[in-house]
Every structure is written in structure tokens, then in C-alpha cells.
Design a protein with these regions (language model features):
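Conserved, single-site charged/polar hotspot
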Residues: 2-188
């Protein structure tokens, strides 16, 4: 699918301040017409001096060209030395998201609730204005791919300490700090 010429959402910058807490700014929060969303965030307690946290939300995957998916073999070799495959399908409470390409050692790892990960990816890869059945079908595809990464311990078997990446070259687009659309939240 080619990116559209006109951006179908507005971007807002949200500034959050509360006494005793570090101020935070979230730039690029995406707002679709007639669509509710929530901007999850937390504030850190101010310790010494004033610090400022800024989160920048990049463009939506349907509006911007991210790296294309790197092809993987449809049938993966099994029983490699030291390989771990879970004995049963498990829906985890948390997954570890590596916020960058696989080999980027400077990218952070985030412990994210599985359900919140699915909501974030869906909000990053599909539009919340789509029909409910279309949203549901896409969410099921996202869940299937993600659970495959969990079940096969895909990255851990390669020596990494995370479950999945945020890079579209390998996995889904997960965006740290992004807003979640109500229609997607409800379906997940």
C-alpha cells in the first residue's frame, strides 16, 4: 500500500506539568476526525533540579515509508543447537520490545504489557476509522505474528534479550509513547 498524499490525521503537541513532577512534552500525537483516543503517559517525580522529557511520535506507517519487511523463510529449520521453543502456546502478560533494528545495541528495551503492545501496533499500522471487522481482522493478524515470535523465542534463540523489535524491517511498528485509538482499544 502506497502512502497517501494528504495526511489523514492531525498532529498535536501535548505539554504535561504537575507540581512535584518533571514536565513532559509529547510531540506528534495523532488525532483522526471524529475518533477518540487516549494519550497514556506517566510523570517522573522531580528529584533535583528541573529536567524535561520530550517524546516524539513519528508518522503513521500508512502515511510514511518505513523499511520494508526483510524476507524470512516460510519454514524455519528446527532442532538447532540450544534452540528453545515453548511447549505450549502462551499469551504472555509482558513482552520485551527492542525499540530499533535487531543489531542496534543503543536502542532501548521496554517491558510492555502484551495487550498494550497490540493496541500500540494496531494504532500505528491501521486507521481507527476503518470498519470494526477490518480492525478486528488486522488485530488478529498482529496477535498471530506476535505470538509466533513469543512461542518460537525467535530473538532469544539468536542470543538477544528481547521478544520483538519495533522495526518494520523485522516485525511490527511499535511506537514508544504513542496515543491509542478508542475503537482499537475496545476491540483488543
Amino acid at each position: 500500500m502506497e502512502p497517501v498524499e494528504q495526511q489523514p490525521y492531525s498532529e498535536y503537541t501535548i505539554q504535561i506539568e504537575a507540581e512535584g513532577f518533571e514536565p513532559k512534552e509529547i510531540a506528534g500525537s495523532q488525532v483522526l476526525a471524529d475518533t477518540l483516543s487516549r494519550q497514556p503517559t506517566t510523570l517522573n517525580v522531580m528529584e533535583s533540579g528541573e529536567t524535561f522529557q520530550r517524546i516524539v511520535i513519528p508518522p503513521h506507517t500508512l502515511f510514511y515509508e518505513y523499511p520494508p519487511k526483510i524476507e524470512e523463510a516460510e519454514i524455519k529449520p528446527i532442532n538447532e543447537n540450544g534452540e528453545i521453543v515453548l511447549s505450549k502456546v502462551v499469551i504472555p502478560e509482558y513482552i520485551v520490545v527492542h525499540d530499533g533494528p535487531v543489531n542496534d545495541s543503543a536502542a532501548g528495551n521496554y517491558y510492555v504489557r502484551y495487550k498494550d503492545y497490540i493496541k500500540n501496533v494496531a494504532s500505528s499500522e491501521i486507521y481507527a476509522t476503518w470498519p470494526d471487522d477490518t480492525i478486528r481482522a488486522n488485530i488478529l493478524a498482529i496477535m498471530s505474528f506476535t505470538l509466533n515470535r513469543v512461542y518460537t523465542e525467535w530473538y532469544r534463540n539468536k542470543g538477544y534479550d528481547f521478544t520483538i523489535t519495533s522495526s518494520t524491517a523485522y516485525d511490527h511498528k511499535w511506537i514508544y509513547g504513542r496515543n491509542i485509538f478508542a475503537s482499537i482499544d475496545r476491540i483488543v
